Swiss-Prot record:
Descriptive protein name: Chaperonin GroEL
Residue sites binding ATP per the record: 30-33, 51, 87-91, 415, 479-481, 495
Broad class of enzyme this protein falls into: isomerase
GO cellular component: a single term: cytoplasm
Assembly and oligomerization: Forms a cylinder of 14 subunits composed of two heptameric rings stacked back-to-back. Interacts with the co-chaperonin GroES.
Species of the source: Francisella tularensis subsp. tularensis (strain WY96-3418)
The gene coding this protein: groEL
């Protein structure tokens, strides 16, 4: 076991803060309408240009192991916020940096770290309640468009595309983002279905960077039993291999030998295949598999219908123009099922909804109906160069996630104003002692950081702007895009409540843990052994 280096107390926290600052300073330049781009070096191909905070954070690895620990912990803030809300990663990073900087000053001054953390936690809970109280529903197309526009770095075209997509497939409908072939952004709506099951092995992923599987024109096998014997699949695999097309297997499960064989064949290029678990449970699972079979033109292979897997042939397989699989979801686009059969299936589900006794059953049936009839909206991003395409696609992805978050939990005034207005909820809030009170004061000050950074990135004087915003009430705030003050909602500058809430909660959580850190342990790098001295040239004695 390699020897370890241990840092304690102020020395440990100082190293950790250096790492946090390095990462946060690189991320926070992207915040706001006048935020700057960051260029990321890639081991192959052209560098990536991005304004996406979490993309910047993910690229950062520091040489000093203790500084790197600090950077990686704050990277977790950005990643968690992106996972939960899909946006707000830069805001979360800025909040975490502000909290940690002030918190470590307080610890150095002799305050109790645990009491500081309790004060921060208490203030966070109160601020979350206030944000929910300030929130307004986001249901009309105009609000949806405004949220999409702001999250796409004030790109009105993107906001309109997202609003149009939601209008066509519904707010709960499936919307995907692809790289387009032209210079202009496009919106296509194609019949499709998404369910919440991903690939059974990451080795099925065709795109190692995004860990996704993209199958063009695949065959689709739908089975309602566990597959553990590969011999049952051999006739299908041989037929698919000869055709040169891909195969998607949807089954209750694929186990042991069968899964291992599929993975090996996929990695060797013998047959391009991906296996996913069937969605749902019990009778609902069988019904959903029948829905997918109807959509893709496949025969549902079930022993209940006197069909055995080993007797299945190519005629029983369905097809679709494209299938996208992630670790969590599978999306089937443009299934080859007959329109009459799909319409008949939809009518059966509608009849079941009318007869459903419980709200739960009705809700699940409506989900199936939406998946079968709603279709998939595809936003095709257009750009002149590949670098611009990647940067724009990241922005559209962010905007889509932010819009979904807004529909889910509502909207608040954007531009950091909601956090400033939430400060009043901390008036009169006290802890059990002075150190807890200081923790509350820390958070009160830290939540001004996003607005200060937006102003700073726009070239303004942050203290002047913050004081001006504080002196007013309601949605009054600062529009950094054109250097004006006014009602943020009327100007269309909105933030999803879920994004602001998630950023605050994750930043406070991580900052609290880091403030209470007293020791750091890292491995000591062993010195590389010296290179042996080279021998003499051929036919000559060795050098002395």
């Amino acid at each position: 076991m390699a020897a370890k280096q241990v840092l304690f107390s102020d020395e440990a926290r100082a190293k950790m803060l250096d790492g946090v600052n390095t990462l946060a300073n690189a991320v926070k330049v992207t915040l706001g309408p006048k935020g700057r781009n960051v260029v990321l070096d890639k081991s192959f191909g052209a560098p990536t240009i991005t304004k996406d905070g979490v993309s910047v954070a993910k690229e950062i690895e520091l040489e000093d192991k203790f500084e790197n620990m600090g950077a990686q912990i704050v990277k977790e803030v950005a990643s968690k916020t992106a996972d939960v809300a899909g946006d707000g990663t830069t805001t979360a990073t800025v909040l975490a940096q502000a909290l940690l900087t002030e918190g470590l000053k307080a610890v150095a001054a002799g305050m109790n770290p645990m009491d500081l953390k309790r004060g921060i936690d208490k203030a966070t809970a109160r601020l979350v309640e206030e944000l929910k109280a300030l929130s307004k529903p986001c249901s009309d197309p105009k609000s949806i468009e405004q949220v999409g526009t702001i999250s796409a770095n004030s790109d009105a075209t993107v906001g309109k595309l997202i609003a149009d997509a939601m209008a066509k497939v519904g707010k709960e409908g499936v919307i995907t983002v692809e790289e387009g072939k032209g210079f202009e952004d496009e919106l296509d709506v194609v019949e499709g279905m998404q369910f919440d099951r991903g690939y059974l092995s990451p080795y099925f992923a065709t795109n190692q960077e995004n860990m996704t599987t993209d199958l063009e024109n695949p065959y689709i096998l739908i089975v309602d039993k566990k597959i553990s014997n590969i011999r049952d699949l051999l006739p299908i695999l041989e037929g698919v291999s000869k055709s040169g097309r891909a195969l998607l297997i949807i089954a209750e499960d694929v186990e042991s030998e069968a899964l291992a064989t599929l993975v090996v064949n996929n990695m060797r290029g013998v047959v391009k295949v991906c296996a996913v678990k069937a969605p749902g449970f019990g009778d609902r699972r069988k019904a959903m598999l029948e829905d997918i079979a109807t959509l893709t033109g496949a025969t549902f292979v079930s022993e209940d219908l006197s069909m055995k897997l080993e007797e299945t042939n190519m005629e029983h397989l369905g097809t679709a123009s494209r299938v996208l699989v992630t670790k969590d979801n599978t999306t089937i686009i443009d299934g080859a099922g007959e329109k009459e059969a799909i319409a008949k299936r939809i009518n059966v589900i509608k009849a079941n909804i009318a007869e459903a006794n419980s709200d739960y059953d009705r809700e699940k049936l409506q989900e199936r109906l939406a998946k079968l009839s709603g279709g998939v909206a595809v936003i095709k991003v257009g750009a002149v160069t590949e670098a611009e395409m990647k940067e724009k696609k990241d922005r559209v992805d962010d905007a889509l996630h932010a819009t979904r978050a807004a529909v889910e939990e509502g909207i608040v005034a954007g531009g950091g104003v909601a956090l400033i207005r939430a400060q009043k909820a901390l008036d009169g809030l006290t802890g059990e002692n002075d150190d807890q009170n200081h923790g509350i004061a820390l958070l009160r000050k830290a939540i001004e950081a996003p607005l200060r950074q937006i102003v700073s990135n726009a070239g303004g004087e942050s203290s002047v702007v913050v004081n001006q915003v504080k002196a007013n009430q309601g949605n009054y705030g600062y529009n950094a895009a054109n250097d004006t003050y006014g009602d943020m909602v009327e100007m269309g500058i909105l933030d999803p409540t879920k994004v602001t809430r998630s950023a605050l909660q994750h930043a406070a959580s991580i900052a609290g843990l880091m403030i209470t850190t007293e020791a750091m342990i890292g491995e000591i790098k062993e010195a590389a052994p010296a290179m042996p001295m080279g021998g003499g040239m051929g036919g000559m004695p060795g050098m002395i």
